[in-house]
């Protein structure tokens, strides 16, 4: 498998829209190289006769019947809020102007 260069890491970071500090490039280069070496090892495993799957353990969703439930009265819900303004909840500002 070919060696991963610092330029390869910069390119992957750019494609992933990651802003990597220059001092971390060498670290990530080594880590990416290790990951790709491991993938190379996985490629050598004989999977002849093994059925394709998307997960190692079969999972089944547990569902329930849909049912109609009463909707709480809007006024009761609004009255539980610490602050309200008319028919709306009043919440602290979280975005700058």
Swiss-Prot record:
One of its GO terms (molecular function) is ATP binding. It catalyses: L-glutamyl-tRNA(Gln) + L-glutamine + ATP + H2O = L-glutaminyl-tRNA(Gln) + L-glutamate + ADP + phosphate + H(+); L-aspartyl-tRNA(Asn) + L-glutamine + ATP + H2O = L-asparaginyl-tRNA(Asn) + L-glutamate + ADP + phosphate + 2 H(+). One of its GO terms (biological process) is translation. It is an enzyme of class 6 (ligase). InterPro entries: Asp/Glu-ADT_sf_sub_c, GatC. Keywords: ATP-binding, Ligase, Nucleotide-binding, Protein biosynthesis. It holds the Pfam family GatC. Its EC number is 6.3.5.-. Belongs to the GatC family. HAMAP family: GatC. Heterotrimer of A, B and C subunits. Allows the formation of correctly charged Asn-tRNA(Asn) or Gln-tRNA(Gln) through the transamidation of misacylated Asp-tRNA(Asn) or Glu-tRNA(Gln) in organisms which lack either or both of asparaginyl-tRNA or glutaminyl-tRNA synthetases. The reaction takes place in the presence of glutamine and ATP through an activated phospho-Asp-tRNA(Asn) or phospho-Glu-tRNA(Gln). This is Aspartyl/glutamyl-tRNA(Asn/Gln) amidotransferase subunit C. It comes from Parasynechococcus marenigrum (strain WH8102).
């Amino acid at each position: 498998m070919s060696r991963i260069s610092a330029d390869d890491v910069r390119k992957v970071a750019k494609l992933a829209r990651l802003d990597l500090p220059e001092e971390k490039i060498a670290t990530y280069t080594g880590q990416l190289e290790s990951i790709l070496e491991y993938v190379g090892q996985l490629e050598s495993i004989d999977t002849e006769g093994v059925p394709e799957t998307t997960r190692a353990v079969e999972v089944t969703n547990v569902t329930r019947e849909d049912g109609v439930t009463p909707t709480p009265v809007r006024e009761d819900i609004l009255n539980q809020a610490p602050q309200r303004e008319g028919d709306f909840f009043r919440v602290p500002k979280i975005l700058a102007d």
